[in-house]
């Protein structure tokens, strides 16, 4: 089973979208094996967005992601990374397919509600950045015995 990192950003938390997003994730068949509401500090934000250091939008990005709580999750399932990315939609909500999280809820590219890992390497890095190994649980969903 593949794992991926997904985070409801401050705009999604502040707008009360955690429950809706979790519902969509579970209905899609992905399993949440870790989750926590947390406040990202500048140090963690800089590690998370290290590839953007030096870019013109970096300070705004750090300011936004540290502006309020986020809901961080580790998801597990077949093709979890691609599945989560399809559910999220394109970064720019105006280009996101109807029915995706960003098309339905995001307001602007800079306030696009959700983040998800884009590769197995970034998923592993982000999971290790936000979760200790003992925070990630293994369990069987009730439906698994029927499939």
Curated annotation (Swiss-Prot):
Question: Which residues are the active-site ones?
Answer: 115 (pros-phosphohistidine intermediate)
Q: Which UniProt keywords apply?
A: ATP-binding, Cytoplasm, Kinase, Magnesium, Metal-binding, Nucleotide metabolism, Nucleotide-binding, Phosphoprotein, Transferase
The Gene Ontology CC terms held by the record are: cytoplasm
Give the taxonomic lineage as stored in the record: Bacteria, Bacillati, Bacillota, Bacilli, Bacillales
Query: Which Cys-Cys disulfides exist here?
Result: none
Domain of life here? Answer: Bacteria
Q: Which cofactor does it need?
A: Mg(2+)
Family affiliation: Belongs to the NDK family.
Listed SUPFAM superfamilies: Nucleoside diphosphate kinase, NDK
Q: What is its EC number?
A: 2.7.4.6
Q: How does it assemble?
A: Homotetramer.
Query: What biological process terms from GO does the record include?
Result: CTP biosynthetic process; GTP biosynthetic process; UTP biosynthetic process
- Annotated ATP binding lies at 9, 57, 85, 91, 102, 112
Protein name in the entry: Nucleoside diphosphate kinase
User: A GO molecular function for this record?
Assistant: nucleoside diphosphate kinase activity
The catalytic activity, as recorded, is:
a 2'-deoxyribonucleoside 5'-diphosphate + ATP = a 2'-deoxyribonucleoside 5'-triphosphate + ADP; a ribonucleoside 5'-diphosphate + ATP = a ribonucleoside 5'-triphosphate + ADP
Answer yes or no on keyword Cytoplasm: yes
**What does the protein in this record do?**
Major role in the synthesis of nucleoside triphosphates other than ATP. The ATP gamma phosphate is transferred to the NDP beta phosphate via a ping-pong mechanism, using a phosphorylated active-site intermediate.
Task: Please state where this protein is localized.
Answer: Cytoplasm
């Amino acid at each position: 089973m593949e794992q991926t990192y997904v985070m409801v950003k401050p705009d999604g938390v502040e707008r009360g979208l955690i429950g809706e997003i979790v519902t969509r994730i579970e209905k899609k068949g992905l399993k949440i094996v870790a989750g926590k509401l947390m406040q990202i500090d500048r140090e963690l934000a800089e590690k998370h967005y290290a590839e953007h250091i030096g870019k013109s939008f970096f300070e705004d990005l750090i300011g936004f992601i540290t502006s309020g709580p986020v809901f961080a999750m580790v998801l597990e399932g077949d093709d979890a990374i691609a599945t989560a990315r399809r559910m999220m939609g394109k970064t720019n909500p105006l280009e996101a397919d109807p029915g995706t999280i960003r098309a339905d809820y995001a307001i602007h590219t800079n306030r696009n509600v959700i983040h998800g890992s884009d590769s197995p390497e970034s998923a592993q890095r982000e999971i290790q950045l936000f979760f200790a190994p003992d925070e990630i649980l293994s369990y069987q969903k009730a439906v698994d015995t029927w499939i």
